[in-house]
């Protein structure tokens, strides 16, 4: 995605731009002006997860989270995300402070940069003057868009991980964890995994489905009759959910009753897409659940493409479809003014100018400090039932086309 940004306009408004030879690179102030155009574009592309974790900020150095388990000291801490060639920020080992069911945690810090090294600078210097500005313009615009997109993906990863697992877990072998640190925050989500021994796509020797998806959710709703905090109101599914419904023999009976379409018999059959939609509509009406389909993908560090919500999994929302918490940005050092340290919150983009050093380089650094924070815990026992996780099928991938290798979607 390329965002049309004219860096030259920003440069023209600044009296003394950074320069080396005939090259002109933007300053932090100019970068921030250019970023405003990108930020507006990203704000118009709200993701589904933003609905459940609206952004917030605080200057507190720690966030209070409600937990049911004490975390070991060695589990605290997480590497700062960065690309090869960028400098890692120092990591502070901190013991979790536990008071009954509450705990405070230092926010996670993420940082990476786009670096123009000496080789690239020399290459740009060999370009004609009328070409240099256009090339630098294009590289800066693409880098800003790329860095901001990666920050949004990191935020999405944190929030989806909380909603899928009830915790944030960074393993030493994580491809984004070059320092090999281990980080675990358990949010104490009560019984997050719903039991389903036999999946919706399981069938017996006669080809009959083992579980009725509609009845399964109707039973969940009935069991929550006297526990409104546990009543399902919606589900968030990845790709393939409608395929599983269409192949479930229990759902096929509903379709046969309403539409007269009999699977496997010599009758007029609708296209597969029409049948899938009919099965999904029937599921919605008979369960009363809102079905949110989220089939977006991201590319992992190793080049593989993954779904944010893995195939065969879904998230059950209880009580309402409103926010389940906030994504809180915490303070970071934003520079110095009149000899005093300046603090700010939210994502940041700054310039690191070392064009006069040996070897020279120029970098745009992007990052943020923050964590998801849940709300809606029971005030008496700190139980939390706003969302649950369900593994509903084993063979959904067979319905989907394989991802081409190392393709960014």
UniProtKB/Swiss-Prot annotation:
Keyword hit for Cell cycle: no
Subcellular compartments: Virion; Host cytoplasm
Any single GO CC term annotated in Swiss-Prot or TrEMBL for this entry: T=7 icosahedral viral capsid
Highest taxon, organism lineage: Viruses
Residues in coiled coil: none
Any Pfam family hit: Phage_cap_E
UniProt keywords, alphabetically: Capsid protein, Host cytoplasm, T=7 icosahedral capsid protein, Virion
Presence of keyword Endoplasmic reticulum: no
Subunit: Homomultimer. Interacts with the portal protein. Interacts with the decoration protein.
Protein function: Assembles to form an icosahedric capsid shell with a T=7 symmetry although with a diameter of about 82 nm, which is a larger volume than the usual T=7 capsids. A dramatic reconfiguration of the capsid shell that expands the procaspid from a diameter of 66 nm to a supersized capsid of 82 nm, allows packaging of the large viral DNA genome. The capsid decoration protein binds the expanded capsid and stabilizes it.
Family: Belongs to the lambda phage major capsid protein family.
Protein name from the UniProt record: Major capsid protein
Species this protein is from: Thermus virus P23-45 (Thermus thermophilus phage P23-45)
């Amino acid at each position: 995605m390329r965002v049309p940004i004219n860096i030259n306009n920003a440069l023209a408004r600044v009296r003394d731009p950074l320069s080396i030879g005939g090259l002109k690179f933007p300053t932090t102030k100019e970068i921030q002006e250019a970023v405003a155009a990108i930020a507006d574009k990203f704000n118009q592309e709200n993701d589904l997860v933003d609905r459940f974790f609206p952004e917030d900020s605080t200057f507190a150095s720690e966030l209070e989270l409600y937990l049911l388990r004490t975390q070991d000291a060695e589990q605290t801490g997480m590497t700062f995300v960065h690309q090869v060639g960028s400098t890692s920020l120092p990591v502070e080992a901190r013991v979790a402070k536990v008071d009954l069911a509450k705990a405070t945690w230092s926010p996670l810090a993420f940082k990476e940069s786009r670096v123009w090294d000496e080789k690239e600078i020399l290459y740009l210097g060999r370009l004609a003057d009328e070409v240099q500005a256009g090339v630098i313009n294009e590289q800066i615009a693409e880098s800003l868009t790329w860095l901001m997109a990666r920050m949004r993906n990191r935020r999405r990863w944190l929030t989806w991980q909380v909603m899928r697992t009830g915790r944030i877990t960074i393993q030493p072998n994580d491809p984004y964890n070059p320092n090999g640190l281990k980080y675990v925050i358990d949010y104490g989500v009560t019984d997050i995994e719903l039991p389903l021994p036999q999946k919706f796509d399981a069938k017996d020797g006669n080809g009959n489905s083992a579980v009725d998806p509609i009845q399964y959710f109707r039973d969940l709703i009935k069991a929550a009759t006297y526990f409104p905090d546990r009543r399902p109101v919606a589900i968030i599914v990845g790709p393939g959910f409608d395929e599983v419904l269409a192949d479930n023999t229990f759902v096929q009976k509903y379709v046969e009753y309403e539409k007269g379409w009999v699977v496997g018999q010599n009758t007029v059959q609708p296209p597969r897409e029409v049948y899938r939609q009919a099965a999904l509509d029937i599921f919605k009406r008979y369960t009363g659940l809102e079905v949110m389909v989220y089939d977006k993908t991201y590319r992992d560090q190793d080049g593989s493409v993954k779904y944010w919500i893995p195939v065969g999994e879904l998230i059950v929302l209880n009580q309402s479809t409103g926010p389940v918490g906030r994504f809180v940005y915490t303070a970071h050092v934003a520079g110095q003014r009149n000899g005093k340290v300046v603090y700010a919150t939210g994502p940041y983009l700054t310039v690191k100018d070392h064009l006069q050093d040996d070897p020279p380089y120029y970098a745009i650094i992007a990052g943020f400090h923050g964590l998801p924070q849940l709300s809606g815990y029971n005030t008496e026992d700190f139980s939390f039932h706003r969302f649950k996780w369900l593994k509903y099928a084993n063979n959904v991938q067979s319905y989907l086309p394989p991802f081409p290798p190392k393709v960014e979607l």
